[in-house]
Amino acid sequence: FELEEPEIAKERYPDVDVLIATHNEDPELLYKTINACTFMEYPDKSKVHIYVCDDTNRLEVAKLADELGVGYFGLADNKDAKSGNYNNALRQTSSPLVATFDADMIPYREFLLETVPYFVEQVEAYENGDDYDKSKVGLIQTPQSFYNADIFQFNLFSESTLPNEQDFFSKEINVFNNSHGAALYKIGRAHV
């Protein structure tokens, strides 16, 4: 299932909340992800609202978020794991679109420019109270690429010789599944 990428005028791009979920990841690893998110391209950068969603409520992560000029939502009790972490953030944000990233993911600079256009007409119809009678897009899931070794690579000391298992799954297996109407949704992956 493929869609033709819509051409959208720059002034039509809506606000988007970028949520980075973290649970005990090292602040040094988080720095790379947060920093990359701040460099994502968008026609009006004031419409991109980046938040670190920390379900362990760590002071050093709140400080890092502040240093990088992004928002921070701490969750003290880790209630409902990652979904609880995201729900906590969603109760405090209001953009019509949400992009999610795991703590160990670095988005491409063009991530928002390549995903948001598919939603613009729907967002405008919703905001104007109009009916939207075209095919609707509810979620765009992009291939998952980590910059740290997965558990198999790490345990086999083969970070440089084996492909990342998650990378292989999202770029090969899930693409095949999608072509047969059976793609899997994986929370935290790079979504809008």
Kindly label every feature range from the protein language model:
Residues F1-R12, A65, G69:
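N-terminal membrane-anchoring/stem segments of glycan-assembly enzymes
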Residues D102-I106:
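The conserved acidic donor/metal-binding loop of glycosyltransferases
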Residues V98:
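Short aromatic/hydrophobic "clamp" motif used to bind/position activated sugar donors
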